[in-house]
Swiss-Prot record:
<dbReference type="InterPro" id="IPR020568">
    <property type="entry name" value="Ribosomal_Su5_D2-typ_SF"/>
</dbReference>
<keyword id="KW-0540">Nuclease</keyword>
<comment type="function">
    <text>RNaseP catalyzes the removal of the 5'-leader sequence from pre-tRNA to produce the mature 5'-terminus. It can also cleave other RNA substrates such as 4.5S RNA. The protein component plays an auxiliary but essential role in vivo by binding to the 5'-leader sequence and broadening the substrate specificity of the ribozyme.</text>
</comment>
<comment type="subunit">
    <text>Consists of a catalytic RNA component (M1 or rnpB) and a protein subunit.</text>
</comment>
<dbReference type="Pfam" id="PF00825">
    <property type="entry name" value="Ribonuclease_P"/>
</dbReference>
<keyword id="KW-0378">Hydrolase</keyword>
<keyword id="KW-0819">tRNA processing</keyword>
<dbReference type="GO" id="GO:0001682">
    <property type="term" value="P:tRNA 5'-leader removal"/>
</dbReference>
<dbReference type="GO" id="GO:0004526">
    <property type="term" value="F:ribonuclease P activity"/>
</dbReference>
<keyword id="KW-0694">RNA-binding</keyword>
<dbReference type="GO" id="GO:0042781">
    <property type="term" value="F:3'-tRNA processing endoribonuclease activity"/>
</dbReference>
<dbReference type="InterPro" id="IPR000100">
    <property type="entry name" value="RNase_P"/>
</dbReference>
<comment type="similarity">
    <text>Belongs to the RnpA family.</text>
</comment>
<dbReference type="InterPro" id="IPR020539">
    <property type="entry name" value="RNase_P_CS"/>
</dbReference>
<dbReference type="InterPro" id="IPR014721">
    <property type="entry name" value="Ribsml_uS5_D2-typ_fold_subgr"/>
</dbReference>
<keyword id="KW-0255">Endonuclease</keyword>
<dbReference type="GO" id="GO:0030677">
    <property type="term" value="C:ribonuclease P complex"/>
</dbReference>
Length: 116
């Protein structure tokens, strides 16, 4: 996934958190806002309570991979932030993908038919 797809500045993150709409479950929350850009932008937020650095980095890698798989289906007019809750620490990859997919559909960031 190219670097242009990630939210890099604090101002962009603050904008998403300030004007947010959200969907969530016990493991993840997705905050999103519509924005006029040629492609979607996203960020991943994981708190320090989520295991050690190795586990946090592994979770971020998994989420980046899931988002990159759906990159052709995600609505390009949105910015979103995926917040990872500590309970998701014990989930296997298949359940992480299932939960993220359901939340992306619920937020209408992807269509139901795009589900892999």
């Amino acid at each position: 996934m190219k670097r242009v797809y990630s939210i890099k500045s604090k101002n962009e993150l603050d904008l998403v958190f300030k004007e947010k709409k959200s969907v969530g479950n016990g493991y993840f929350v997705i905050y999103f806002i519509p924005h006029e850009t040629p492609h979607f932008k996203y960020a991943i937020s994981i708190g320090k309570k989520f295991g050690n650095a190795v586990e946090r980095n592994q979770a971020k890698r998994r989420l980046r991979y899931i988002v990159s798989n759906y990159s052709n289906y995600i609505n390009p007019k949105y910015r979103f932030v995926i917040v990872v809750r500590p309970q998701s620490n014990l989930l296997p990859y298949d359940l992480i993908k299932e939960n993220i997919t359901k939340l992306l559909i619920k937020a209408k960031l992807i269509e139901k038919e795009a589900q892999n």
